[in-house]
Amino acid sequence: MAPKAEKKPAEKKPAEEKAGEKAPAAGKKPKAEKRLPASKGEKGGEGKKERGRKKAKKSVETYKIYIFKVLKQVHPDIGISSKAMSIMNSFINDIFEKLAGEAAKLARYNKKPTITSREIQTSVRLVLPGELAKHAVSEGTKAVTKFTSS
């Protein structure tokens, strides 16, 4: 029972302090701003605006499902942590941005308005080092021929 008795006066003291500070707080804007979001009237007003139209979810595009599919093709018995998946997703986004930027530069240099598979292939050769570029080009060519044949 003693802890409850101690808690009640502690709860009343901030209320008394708020009541004591109420008169000077009228001139202070930060105190008034802190109290405004706490009121239910304003939250209800915002809710009325959202009732007519629901807030659309922002779609976040990731490569997570594709990374997982490739992992299962290569190592069917191995899993991947969410942190490792996030790192892989960031890695793919980074490589994509580098390749797209390089392809855009190549198109600009050649005064062409379109990025074709040729610009992508050249950008892969420029961005990726040595043997990795050769493998990437061969896999990319294979994927493009498979896509065009179907």
UniProtKB/Swiss-Prot annotation:
Keywords: Acetylation, Chromosome, DNA-binding, Isopeptide bond, Nucleosome core, Nucleus, Ubl conjugation. The keyword Acetylation applies. InterPro entries: Histone-fold, Histone_H2A/H2B/H3, Histone_H2B, HISTONE_H2B_site. GO terms for cellular component: nucleosome; nucleus. Residues 1-21, 33-49 have a biased composition (Basic and acidic residues). It is found in: Nucleus; Chromosome. GO terms for molecular function: DNA binding; protein heterodimerization activity; structural constituent of chromatin. It comes from the Eukaryota. Signal peptide: none annotated. Pfam families: Histone. There is a cross-link at K146 (Glycyl lysine isopeptide (Lys-Gly) (interchain with G-Cter in ubiquitin)). Its main location: nucleus. Can be acetylated to form H2BK6ac and H2BK33ac. Residues 1-58 are annotated as: Disordered. PROSITE patterns: HISTONE_H2B (PS00357). The modification N6-acetyllysine is found at K7, K34. Belongs to the histone H2B family. Core component of nucleosome. Nucleosomes wrap and compact DNA into chromatin, limiting DNA accessibility to the cellular machineries which require DNA as a template. Histones thereby play a central role in transcription regulation, DNA repair, DNA replication and chromosomal stability. DNA accessibility is regulated via a complex set of post-translational modifications of histones, also called histone code, and nucleosome remodeling. The nucleosome is a histone octamer containing two molecules each of H2A, H2B, H3 and H4 assembled in one H3-H4 heterotetramer and two H2A-H2B heterodimers. The octamer wraps approximately 147 bp of DNA. This is Histone H2B.2. It comes from Oryza sativa subsp. indica (Rice).
